[in-house]
């Protein structure tokens, strides 16, 4: 579980959390709401390890894998499919490990220990889903509104909004126990939005999402976390259930 106990969090001279205490349980889908500038994105920075608490105790299980949509505009000639496949960090790590072992085996083909390592590396890669990585990535890309003929198109050939859809697909491709989403519906049309809602409803891990879209939050979350006056308040229900007012999008 994720726990904050009497956490103090500052950005420069501004105190964003002052003695905040809350617990989020595994598998909960949380809508993080609050006025613009209240500290929602800063809390994400605490969760992903970019920032550290200035006081109190904060913990996320060390074994949890985390996924988050990169906010930078991707600049690459990689195909859309290859770019999204690269979001599977576990697969990438295993591919790199396999390449290193294959190089060692080429240099010492009679070394039985290296041969055994090579066999284990192939097994690990298969267990991680190497065989269906491409179709899994392409299902995400198509679900977010791309056409079949665009699957092999270079990322740089797309406009900014479509590239950010690819960043979203890349985050969804990453095996994760904790998924952080900051305004994920930006750049999405209705069909892609409906598809994303269905995907997130099936997601088995813990999810925390920032959004100004009340209907979207109602569709994909079951817990609401409200940040206001440097405190966190947890509600057992969607944002509509809590009757909280969402700020207009900045």
Region locations from a protein language model:
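A short, hydrophobic C-terminal helix/tail in secreted or cell-surface proteins
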Residues: 245-250
């Amino acid at each position: 579980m994720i726990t904050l106990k009497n956490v103090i969090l500052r950005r420069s001279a501004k105190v964003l959390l002052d003695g905040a205490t809350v617990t989020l349980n595994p598998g909960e889908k949380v809508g993080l709401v609050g006025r613009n500038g209240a500290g929602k994105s800063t809390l994400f920075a605490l969760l992903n390890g970019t920032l550290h608490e200035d006081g109190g105790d904060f913990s996320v299980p060390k074994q949890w894998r985390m996924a988050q949509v990169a906010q930078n505009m991707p600049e690459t000639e990689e195909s859309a499919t290859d770019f999204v496949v690269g979001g599977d960090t576990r697969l990438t790590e295993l591919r790199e490990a396999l390449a290193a072992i294959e190089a060692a085996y080429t240099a010492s083909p009679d070394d039985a220990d290296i041969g055994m390592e090579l066999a284990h590396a192939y097994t690990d890669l298969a267990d991680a889903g190497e065989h269906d990585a491409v179709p899994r990535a392409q299902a995400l890309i198509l679900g977010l509104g791309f056409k079949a003929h665009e699957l092999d198109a270079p990322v740089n050939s797309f406009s900014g909004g479509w590239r950010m859809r690819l960043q979203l697909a890349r985050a969804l491709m990453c095996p994760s126990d904790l998924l952080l989403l900051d305004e994920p519906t930006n750049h999405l049309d209705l069909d892609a939005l409906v598809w994303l809602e269905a995907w997130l409803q099936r997601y088995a891990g813990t999810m925390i999402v920032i959004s100004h879209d009340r209907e979207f939050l109602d569709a994909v979350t079951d817990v609401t976390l409200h940040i206001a006056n440097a405190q966190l308040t947890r509600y057992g229900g969607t944002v509509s259930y809590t009757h909280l007012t969402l700020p207009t999008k900045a």
